Amino acid sequence: MTTTPPPFSIRQAALPVYLPTLLFAAGESAFVPVIPVIAKNLGSDLAAAGIIAGMLTVGILIGDLPSGWIIARIGERAAMLWSTLIALIGGSIALLSTTPWMLGAGIFLIGIATASFALARHAFLTSFIPLSHRARSLSMLGGMFRGGSVMGPLAASAVLAATGNALAPFWLMVGFTLAAGAVLLFLPDPEKTFGVVRRVKDRTGHSVTAGELEVENEGHGLFKTIHKNLGALLRLGVAAGIIQILRAGRSVLLPLWAVSIGMRDADTALIIGIAAIVDFALFFTSGQVMDRYGRLAASVPTMLVMSVSFMVLSFTHGFAAVDVWFIALAMTLAIGNGLSSGIVLTLGADLADKKNPAQFLGAWRFTTDSGAAAGPLIIGGVIAISSISVAAFATGIIGLIGMGMMIRYVPRYTPAAQSKR
């Protein structure tokens, strides 16, 4: 007599996927507000501090390249465990750093680990979560990431206020990452929790799960896929990449600005944490806006609000109430960013071949992550030759250019998605 397995519940993914994601994201976001302070303490100027902060997104970009192949070879769970180990090594290097560039090397390793962890958790959901629950599970995954982005800075603010040690958030990062690794390490085999999954052969004959095959295919023939889809990637891909420039600019410019106006570390982390709450509150609304009113209804307001906010910020450095302006614009940037949560992934899905999306999505991810990596480098370069105010204004101008590209190219490349009402 056979028994019918119990119906699947998203709660089954809470421990193997959602809790480690929450902890890993909290660890990553805990130290971001203090990178410029630590870099400055090690002898860096503002320009170099911006570049060092940007090593996180550069590491993510570089980590994107081999991660799919590695996950297909060692499995999703093992890849997440190795990612936590690499992140711990990066955090340890940052804690022990004696030069700005040693700090940058540690942050770069954390970026590589972040890329691998993100792909592995996506592959895990694809492999083990039934199709009927997949959209909700991916939405919940995004929510866990944003929850960690709230938890990290708020926890960092508390330990900074208690200790006065700028390195304390890196200790937090180590603690959160160890906790994520422990959850993954001591959980039972996923196939005992979710049931045995169907395995297939990849192009080399290696046995993989559906999720492992998907992320492996994303990286296969990357540059050939970029060349094949060059028109769309140079137009809409670059426009989406500029959204990532604005987002990365927000993550880097706000802590740099706080250092330049003499704000306390704990206050900076607290403001960034509260801004993350504002961002998080708009997470679900943005998806509804995109589905009901089209992609431009989310992307254009985001780029307009964030661009104008950066441009206004550039004029406030000498104002009497500079702290108040900083807080107000940090919240405005959070609102702008929250209005388009998921827009980059959604546009990529709109453009991808519905029968074989993985390779295009890999090229799309590489293009848009290039924007995220370029943002801090542009900011650091402009600060080096001019000032942080000019860097903020230039970021706003780039955002307005991207908005114009969105207005022109979204209707051309995604007419069906844009026509939704």
Segments from the language model and where they lie:
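Helix-loop boundary and gating motifs at the non-cytosolic
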Residues: F8-T57, L234-A239, R247-I261
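Juxtamembrane intracellular "pre-TM" segments in multi-pass secondary transporters
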Residues: T2-R11, D189-L236, R421
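C-terminal ends and interior cores of transmembrane alpha-helices
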Residues: I86-T98, V305-F319
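Helix-to-loop junctions at the C-terminal end of transmembrane segments
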Residues: G63-G75, L282-R295, I383
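Symmetry-related core transmembrane helices of the 12-TM Major Facilitator Superfamily/SLC fold
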Residues: P169-L185, A392-R408
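Helix-breaking motifs and short loop linkers at transmembrane-helix boundaries and internal kinks
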Residues: G43, G75, L96-W101, G294, ...
